[in-house]
Curated annotation (Swiss-Prot):
GO molecular function (one): structural molecule activity
Compartment(s) where it occurs, according to its Swiss-Prot or TrEMBL record: Cytoplasm, Cytoskeleton, Microtubule organizing center, Spindle pole body
Record's protein name: Sporulation-specific protein 74
Organism: Saccharomyces cerevisiae (strain ATCC 204508 / S288c) (Baker's yeast)
Transcription recorded as keyword: no
Complexes and interactors: Interacts with itself. Interacts with MPC54, NUD1 and SPO21/MPC70.
Keyword Magnesium in annotation: no
One GO process term, biological-process aspect: ascospore formation
Top-level taxonomy: Eukaryota, Fungi, Dikarya, Ascomycota, Saccharomycotina
Length: 413
């Protein structure tokens, strides 16, 4: 039985049982020697019908015997070549040995069997292979540094931290709430202690309490906070203007005391008796009218409180007389200051130093003129310029209305 017919038979049968476990061991030499006698006996013996199992066993035995006979022939040929190689003095390992031939013979046999093919030569299915591949873990700490290798650990800085902008904003908000609100509250307390700004301070206090205690919309809260800051800025501007005005007035009032001026008797009419009685107070009534009610206010002048404070000339055309309508001492009538020049005013009024500001509208921004008469030195001119400049910085619409008595009384103290 040839090897081709053996393989065809094995492929048809598909090896229902595993060929690895069913192959028998090599038969004994005695059974091989009696091969011829067994063949003769089979010829002489009557023919018997073989079952399917007997045929399988006989085919298996035939394959094993054929393999053994082939190995025996190879062994005999190798011995013959060994003797020939000894005569030729060739290398002993130049021809394949018996074990190598047996290994190749068994390898070729087992690789051609159907069981080996089904077990070790299955085609690769890509779909089943992809199913076994797990999803890789994404690396989130991807470094964009151009330097290769592992970077050394560094402490987080102001620009490297991921939450720098958020934390910085939180710190700024906490700083504003703790420090700015405290500053505004203290400024409002200072405004409440101020006499001319008390009413404005009360309004600022109401806004501050509304911002602090009531839960309002963010935009409205920011609006209130901006108004408070603007009010405080206005308060400081007005306070500075009032301080400059007060300093200028004090310099002006102290100027005659620092100079060696002649006595008041030199300017007095010698025919008038000396009256040592004190001057009447402001609220004293004469002829049914007070000192302020005796004279009318001009239409184009006002003081820094928004009230008209300049006095107009009397009906008879003379200068205002202060104590009695029948006063003997009368001065010459003069024109208003706005309708005459400086030289004419000095010529007609010898006491122009006392009335130089009569009729001047300071609040409307009229610049001060330079009077270079006797007794007007540089310090006086600077003080007067500062006084007129401070009047222009005051907003009359924001000032509370007060009477003349209150105004004059607090400024003198």
């Amino acid at each position: 039985m040839g090897a081709g017919t053996l393989l065809n038979g094995l492929e048809k049968e598909n090896f229902p049982n595993n060929i690895h476990s069913d192959l028998p061991a090599y038969p004994n030499m005695d059974s091989q020697e009696d091969g011829n006698t067994s063949k003769e006996s089979k010829r002489n013996s009557p023919v018997k019908q073989k079952s399917q199992k007997d045929e399988e066993k006989s085919s298996k035995m035939g394959t094993a015997s054929n393999i053994f006979h082939e190995n025996k022939d190879i062994h005999e040929r190798s011995e013959h070549t060994d003797d020939f190689n000894d005569g030729l003095k060739l290398a002993p390992d130049s021809s394949p040995s018996l074990k190598e031939c047996q290994f190749k013979n068994w390898e070729s046999f087992w690789c051609n069997t159907e069981g080996y093919k089904t077990k070790h030569m299955q085609p690769f299915h890509f779909t089943s292979g992809l199913e076994e591949i797990k999803e890789p873990v994404m690396e989130l700490n991807i470094s964009t540094s151009p330097y290769k290798g592992q970077r050394p650990n560094s402490a987080p800085t102001e620009y490297s931290a991921a939450t720098t902008a958020f934390t910085k904003t939180q710190l700024e908000v906490s700083f504003l709430k703790t420090n700015l609100l405290t500053y505004i509250k203290k400024e409002i307390d200072i405004c409440l202690s101020s006499v001319p700004f008390f009413d404005d301070a009360v309004q600022m206090q109401k806004k501050f309490l509304e911002y602090r205690d009531i839960d309002l919309d963010e935009e409205y809260e920011l609006k209130i906070l901006g108004e408070l800051l603007n009010d405080l800025n206005f308060f400081h501007m007005q306070e500075n203007s009032l301080l400059n005005r007060e300093l200028a007035v004090r310099r002006f009032s102290n100027q005659p005391e620092s100079q060696n001026l002649p006595s008041i008797r030199d300017f007095r009419n010698p025919l008038l008796p000396i009256d040592n009685r004190p001057s009447p107070p402001l609220g004293l009534k004469r002829n049914g009218k007070s000192f302020e009610e005796t004279y009318d206010f001009t239409s184009n002048t006002s003081n820094f409180w928004g009230e008209k404070a300049e006095l107009q000339n009397s009906i008879t055309g003379g200068t205002p007389y202060f104590f009695h309508p029948n006063n003997i001492h009368q001065t010459k009538p003069f024109m208003s200051f706005e309708n005459q020049n400086e030289l004419l005013f000095q010529r007609k009024n010898s006491d122009y130093k006392q009335h130089f500001n009569s009729g001047r509208n300071i609040h409307n921004g009229v610049e001060s003129k330079s009077y270079r008469g006797v007794g007007l030195n540089d310090s006086y001119q600077k003080g007067y310029a500062a006084m007129t400049k401070s009047f222009g910085n005051i907003d009359l619409n924001r000032m509370p209305r007060r009477s003349n008595e209150e105004m004059y009384s607090w400024s003198r103290n």
